[in-house]
Amino acid sequence: MLRHSHILMAGGVLCCLLSFAAFVPAWAGSGGASAPSDAELNPVGECIRECTGTPGASAAAVEDGWSLQSKRWRSSERPAEGGTETAEQSMSVAREPRGIVGGSAPSNRWQLVNTDFESRYYGVPIANGCLGLMPGRAPMSLKSVMLSNVYDSRSNHGVSRIATGLNPFALSLCVDGVAVSDSTVTDRRQTLDMRHAWFEDDFKLGDKARVNWQLRALRELPYAGLVSVEVRALQDVRLSVEGRITSPRNFAQIDSGVITRHIETTPFEIRRLRSRTPQRGVLLCAAAATFTENGTMPADTLLRAGQTLRFHILGSLVSETDLADPWNEAERFVIYGLGEGPERLVARHEALWDELWQGDIRIEGDPDAQLFARAALFQMYSNAREGRAASIPPFGLSDREYCGHIFWDSELWMYPPLLFLNGGIARSLVDYRTERLSGARHKASLYGYRGALFPWESDDSGEESCPTNALTGTFEHHISSDVAIGIWNYYRMTGDKEWLREKGWPVLREVADFWVSRVEWNKDGSCSVKGVVGADEFAHHVTDNAFTNGSAIVALRAACAAAQALDIHGSIAEWERVASALRILQREDGVTDEFEGYAGQTVKQADVNLLAYPLQLVTDPAAIRRDLEYYEPRIHPHGPAMSQAILALQWARLGEGAKAYEIYQKGLDGPLHGPFLAFSETAGHGDTCFMTGMGGFLQLFINGFCGLELTDEGIVQLPAALPPHWKRITVTGVGPERRTYINARK
């Protein structure tokens, strides 16, 4: 039975604490738990009874491994008894890495390994499109826990910000009174398995025990995760374990309890914690059970040398944003998982990830590019899910940067690769917008326009959430076009006319009406859009920004095409008139001007170049080349990394594979970090996953090097040049028919 259970205040953090220990016969699956490590979650080592060790101390340096371009990280398969079979290869069981990427390492590897805990640590989230778990540097730790689309406020009068959640996976583990911490572990190795979405922390605790901790955000249960722990005694030891639910210190209205539920005849004790965010008072509820196949773990058991303890923590986190009764729903998820058992939970999780990987990118001749493509796809699949009308913030569920709001990043950068490789997830992203059309209508009316003006920064409400110190929230109106183009492309990909009529058409119609009311007519019969911020956010309040006008043209034409597809009559002539009259400015030498009066200034990110791709308005190769050559040196060297992806894509389509690869490498140099290929917005920008940049480079692989293009007639494959050392690129699971496309060197 449990030794004690109570609410404990430690270091300003409220915890629901359970203490237990046991020896358990070997049982299928390995397990895990986590101790929070950042300022908002309880540090490892607090709330521990009779344990020693110094949380936060650094482990000894361990030799680093494989290189990707100029950086040095390690890529190797995690050792497993008997090996782990995948669809493409049998994973290595060797303890040490076998080769250097770019040399002898195979290009179809699925695992990334870290053994360096002294350098700056760059983690990546383990997520299921709803629940995001961010492993930390400290052993068995979580830096953050987040739910998508759940927001609090930055302050009493601040805009919304994605909320940090409760942590139902917190764990403290002691062996003979020595706590697991940075200073007490050795021979440590972290592994990220991208094939089946698990994260592992494996280490020795002195000469007493070897510990293996695995983390999964369960794909089949959007609000639940599974931590599995295995402790193998190297000598006779006494094991003590404390499982907790922790809450950020500024959360309010705490309520908790422990309740026993019987699954058939087996008793399980479930701890629960209820808390509210500090500003908006959003209710978050967590539940967790620490268990073996025999039920809740008993306390104070000796492990003999050679014996193994295996246990699991099944946790759930639910908010009232998504479910009306989060307190009971959180418990129901845990009860369901206990009934299923860890074997079935993991099997279903892996089967669903196998389905996701039907949409894959395979590169022959460049193991580094293969790993990066897989890492980018892994994060894209991890941060969104089918059947949930939610979109992806620029940093996904890895961080609270940009308040976790939804920008154009979703439609222009992350959505396109998902549209090609997973229509179900793509549908979730467009449904997020269609369900918030009323808010866009309201915003347009507030500023004196007709139709729909979508917020530049959107949260769960669908209203404008951009801080007022940024002009983008007031003037970056191309967001409405971005939304409309994404919706039209969903119809072009799927041909789902019923969806178009019910969901897509209202948005296309309202965005077209917005642009008709937004333009100003000139004496020469052309029309202009004045006072905007374009994709180049360095240029404020300009007239006839290239991308703004270009995206409006495409959105207006999409509305016309949708009306024709649905046999709807009305405003088509007016939409066509505006689309034909909008100005795209050009110089005498044929270079496209970014806006009226542009004089060669440095630009933040690609703007004019987006007219060729993705807008497909500039199609003449000579014109595309002129704009590339003019604007490439004018893009800020420390601007967002997705610009290089767009430039490289267009060079590949122009037949210059070497040039495309050179720009691709430039785009990765700085933002890409080991050991898990975390991708930051700019060089040195924090331990986050910049989903926007990853989406841009996925488009480079799919639409650039493989040449895929979405048209009104469906998918076509355009000629495209490969980098000189690549043999081929294969993109699988494309479109509703799940086709395979190959571009191979002849």
Model regions and ranges:
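Bacterial N-terminal signal peptides that target proteins for export
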Residues: L2-V13
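Cysteine-centered motifs
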Residues: C15-C16, C47, C51
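Helix-terminus loop motifs that line ligand-binding clefts
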Residues: A384-S398, G424-I485, Y491, E498-E502, ...
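Bacterial N-terminal signal peptides
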Residues: G11-A22
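C-terminal capping/lid segments that line or modulate ligand- or cofactor-binding pockets
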Residues: D116-Y151, W413, S465, W521, ...
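Active-site core of glycosidic bond-cleaving carbohydrate-active enzymes
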Residues: I406-R436, I485, N489-M493, E502, ...
